[in-house]
Amino acid sequence: MLAKRIIPCLDVRDGQVVKGVQFRNHEIIGDIVPLAKRYADEGADELVFYDITASSDGRVVDKSWVSRVAEVIDIPFCVAGGIRSIDDAAKILSFGADKISVNSPALSDPTLITRLADRFGVQCIVVGIDTWFDDATGKYHVNQYTGDENRTRVTQWETLDWVQEVQQRGAGEIVLNMMNQDGVRNGYDLTQLKKVRDVCRVPLIASGGAGTMEHFLEAFRDADVDGALAASVFHKQIINIGELKAYLAGQGVEIRIC
């Protein structure tokens, strides 16, 4: 059995790490490189960086900080933000990133996933999915351009359909960003995670809602996700990564202990 992964998420805007609630009202957390080094030193298995306004601004991620992160950490990291072409991805990977993630650009052009997978291999192609539960319809819908609350829009895709579509096109991993739960720290949406797990054959990463160590345990034990991504509980030092891993190991979760 592969070890489960603990993955801090760093949302980047204007060269700094920020964090919002339900993808809105972002506050500045701190500088990118020191935070990345701190999480690596604490025992994170990998890091994910989202340049949250790159897609909505029509630009690619700022590469200047990617190489600086690669110099100070020795764990894998994934970068997302406005990647629309093989050339965009190649540049980010050449600066030291281990994986690239596509979200809004893939919704605009689903063939991008296949082209990236064919060029770089599925192992480094992650698809992020920003999913919102609609109380009125009882359905999960995929949103686009979520880094800018003024440009966010609901797509025609229902989440489960898009999960299956991106796998067919070559996604090697899926990060499910559950927008309703984002930043509120009341637990991952286990109902949605289980539904996605049933149709997801590639590694699945849960994102949105972690507030306690028990929430991580529930995601691993009840929804069988491969990794759990979180931001605010790590940024605000509510949970220490080393202590979290010790807790999970004590609960029988296969986890890498530093």
Curated annotation (Swiss-Prot):
It comes from the Bacteria. Its EC number is 4.3.2.10. InterPro entries: Aldolase_TIM, His_biosynth, HisF, IGPS_HisA/HisF, RibuloseP-bd_barrel. One of its GO terms (cellular component) is cytoplasm. It is found in: Cytoplasm. Pathway: Amino-acid biosynthesis; L-histidine biosynthesis; L-histidine from 5-phospho-alpha-D-ribose 1-diphosphate: step 5/9. CDD domains: HisF. Keywords: Amino-acid biosynthesis, Cytoplasm, Histidine biosynthesis, Lyase. Gene3D superfamilies: Aldolase class I (3.20.20.70). The active site is at residues 11, 130. The keyword Amino-acid biosynthesis applies. It catalyses: 5-[(5-phospho-1-deoxy-D-ribulos-1-ylimino)methylamino]-1-(5-phospho-beta-D-ribosyl)imidazole-4-carboxamide + L-glutamine = D-erythro-1-(imidazol-4-yl)glycerol 3-phosphate + 5-amino-1-(5-phospho-beta-D-ribosyl)imidazole-4-carboxamide + L-glutamate + H(+). GO terms for biological process: L-histidine biosynthetic process. Pfam families: His_biosynth. The keyword Amino-acid biosynthesis applies. GO terms for molecular function: imidazoleglycerol-phosphate synthase activity; lyase activity. Belongs to the HisA/HisF family. Heterodimer of HisH and HisF. IGPS catalyzes the conversion of PRFAR and glutamine to IGP, AICAR and glutamate. The HisF subunit catalyzes the cyclization activity that produces IGP and AICAR from PRFAR using the ammonia provided by the HisH subunit. This is Imidazole glycerol phosphate synthase subunit HisF. It comes from Salmonella arizonae (strain ATCC BAA-731 / CDC346-86 / RSK2980).
